[in-house]
Amino acid sequence: MNVLLISSSPHKQKSSTFLLAGEVLRGLREEGVICETLHLDDFKVLFCKHCEACHKNLLRCSLKDDVQGILKKMLNADGIVFASPNYINQVTASMKALFDRSAHFIHCKRLFNKYVAGVVSSGSGQNKEVLDYIAFYGHTCAAQYSGGVSALRQFGEDTKAEAFKLGKKLASDMKEKKLYPDQMQIIEQGKQHFARIIKLRKDDWQEEYKYWVEKGWL
């Protein structure tokens, strides 16, 4: 099993966000999971132009940056940990840009059978909305959400233990291929919604339509 940590703090390895995420990775590694870390600040991530190139030709994009490589790593992972500081009750701009650029993942539910977890830090402690948003993104891509952990910039041993436990839980979910009934209901509703859209736009988005047919979803 392998997990990809995508961290969007501009402070990278020195950030509270990454330090907290590191405890999640420690829990994962103790269970034998191979972990890789990407700091978004090391990559060029442009804003989505809504050109629809990724819908017409899978994983293609008119923008020339590093996003396609990141998306391929996401596809190759069994689980993904999204870690972000709280920027006005939202993920950072770079993380949001990455989410927007993965629109094809949403259309074609490309994180189906994968697992997502969230890590958030802030100065205010008002992090629930950000974790909820990470969970929402995971569900729109058809992933199971194993949970999240959040903390103030200065956190203690209890919070570290919570993050470590989350890593263990993520590893267990992946190993057991755990399905959460309430989440599956949300995912199924999303599939029904996009099934209608994909059929409606099948002439414009031929490769996405073909993907759905090959999956047996249409």
Feature map (PLM): residue ranges:
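N-terminal beta1-alpha1-beta2 submodule of the flavodoxin-like/Rossmannoid cofactor-binding fold
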Residues: 1-104, 144, 161-218
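Short beta->alpha junction loops
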Residues: 39-42, 149-154
